[in-house]
């Protein structure tokens, strides 16, 4: 199994979206690349942690490739806007692909170059190493499964 992290705005919808992709084995939501250990949701929202609301994705590369996951991801984000997705505004809502395997960095860089042709503005989605990841509070895990009519910037219909 391979691992990758995605920051795609509010992590509730991003998690549900990746859960629907064949080959994704497991997801969780948390706070990534924080300058504070074990931040709370309130601390992340305050901007003092510089953390990203992120989704951990464990996937079977025999069923879905990283390229395919990035293609799917770009269908539900605006990669040309920094620190905002939909109505969610703040540094925690910036977009990014955060790798564990250093070999993935080059693949992501190349994929971003290819995808840039589809956008008139520069892609500002981050391509960085996952430095740390703190699991978000339990009520955030699988939020839209527990609250099917909850707020989401991603349209599933």
UniProtKB/Swiss-Prot annotation:
Active site annotation, chain numbering: 10
GO biological process: cellular response to oxidative stress; protein modification process
Coiled coil start-end: none
Knockout-associated phenotype: Non-essential, it can be deleted.
Catalytic activity line of the entry: L-methionyl-[protein] + [thioredoxin]-disulfide + H2O = L-methionyl-(S)-S-oxide-[protein] + [thioredoxin]-dithiol; [thioredoxin]-disulfide + L-methionine + H2O = L-methionine (S)-S-oxide + [thioredoxin]-dithiol
Keywords recorded for this protein, A-Z: Oxidoreductase
Catalytic class of the enzyme: oxidoreductase
InterPro entries cross-referenced by the UniProt entry: Met_Sox_Rdtase_MsrA_dom, Met_Sox_Rdtase_MsrA_sf, MsrA_MetSO_reductase
Molecular function GO labels: L-methionine-(S)-S-oxide reductase activity; peptide-methionine (S)-S-oxide reductase activity
GO cellular component: cytoplasm
Disulfide bonds: none
EC numbers, comma separated: 1.8.4.11
Gene3D superfamilies, per the entry: Peptide methionine sulphoxide reductase MsrA (3.30.1060.10)
Entry-linked Pfam families: PMSR
PANTHER family assigned to the protein according to its UniProt record, in alphabetical order: MITOCHONDRIAL PEPTIDE METHIONINE SULFOXIDE REDUCTASE (PTHR42799:SF2)
NCBIfam families: msrA
Job description of the protein: Has an important function as a repair enzyme for proteins that have been inactivated by oxidation. Catalyzes the reversible oxidation-reduction of methionine sulfoxide in proteins to methionine.
Family: Belongs to the MsrA Met sulfoxide reductase family.
Protein name, per record: Peptide methionine sulfoxide reductase MsrA
Lineage: Bacteria, Bacillati, Mycoplasmatota, Mycoplasmoidales, Mycoplasmoidaceae
